[in-house]
């Protein structure tokens, strides 16, 4: 039985195979239901985001929303990003943003041109970014060139500051649409600008991503999964972990475990006054995580409504999918407490706003630099 840094003991069967994917009941958080006799507080600052460290409580717990700057750090400018005027894009589609202490700059990996490039922009302050021209394709800031006919979908780039292998310092996942069918691949890089030969992963859906659990030294893949219990299509997440990123990426179906979904407490409205289809519940569109102080922080991307869940409806109506980002917290890296069901980052339906509709968490979630 593995004992974690905080005194929690994991069961012999790990990851658990008992998460309910057949209903909308709340998912369990075992370490809150049966707390260890002694909670260890030696790792990281202790965050009172749940009741794990609280013996008695007569206070009101209050969560706060993020305050957004309406001005984007990137907007489509280059021919690749403008994509001949068809769905221009210069934004993370997960991808990643990191402060790299090796060269003292912030690196933003982003989706450049719809279903096209994965590009790199750099910044000295994390707010003002310039495109880093690279030699992978002359005149562009692509970090790699896809095969002819291959179109990128979701992507994730991670800076691994704990690796003992310098050539694997940057790790990347891509989901591709190809003439032969969809495929997902991983690759590694020493400099985050030139990646080596890829390895094909196990089966997964688009918007799959990965993260590093620093408390258990595990690489975890957040795998898009359809729920079997509903008469409509509903999204959830499955979980797969490994010790070595490249060697462990080719998982078999029986190695993954059902992980997370929405439940009866998830809100069926988002912006005040905006009500979506109440006949069908919200869906878990994505889940990205990062180790933060003494917990794993997760951002649950929850899609609201039903009609907008279909791409054709969105395209015909000119309205993007409505996705808000909700915060969750885990002390074992698998089970999440979500006491607050209001969005941490709320999208808007306001036409012309950069925060309209289709919000995605960036790989790494939050930046930690020498100053803040």
What are these regions (language model features)?
Residues 360-362, 369:
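Extended C-terminal regions of large enzymes
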Residues 1-285, 290-356, 370-372:
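Beta-rich carbohydrate-recognition and catalytic domains
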